[in-house]
Amino acid sequence: MKRILTFFIFMLLAMGPGAAGAQTVVMDEGHVAFDYPDSWLVVSPQLCGVYAPLLEDAGLDADELARELEQTRTLSRAYNENYTQYLSVMIGEDELSQEIYEIENATDNQRATLRRRVEANSFWETTGLRTQDAEWQKEDGGYWLYAHYTVTRAGETVGRGLRYITVRNGLYVEMDWRIASGRFSGRDLNAFRARLADLVVTEQIAEPVRDV
């Protein structure tokens, strides 16, 4: 059985995090939905307070986490059992994403510009992220910018992450996987790429007419 979550209706409030089946999270703000592992704890800015006791047991302050998710436009995040890794769905927006609007319409120059921003660490939503490599990949006919990055604090590496970035409805839609220690294996990379099939667009918004 699948659990369908929408962070505007809060269907999750009546259900524990360990219910059977996949956790399908519908995120209206980003016009997307994503299937999280069923055993992971899913939070959003609105749900951090609901799971405050569980988060505090893991050393996470619910209010601080809610602010972080809001500031980074993280629509949802799921933690594994021991909170050593998490998956997130994020959105962003700027002039370039509005110009592209849908990734299929992106020109070579626009894709090159976005890749340069990621490589130069100017795309990231917070400081301390350092791109290790980035490349465009094509999956199911759509372009995704893949990036591998490290998380640094005071010059020390405290985590690593993988991210896929595309453009839908004028928004950057991003799927992120971060681990607190260790390195990603080739098997991890393949598994993460396969997760792209679990991220779907739920609504297509007509592109606004722009003055020439």
Q: Which residues does each predicted region cover?
A:
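Surface-exposed amphipathic alpha-helical segments
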Residues: 40, 169-212
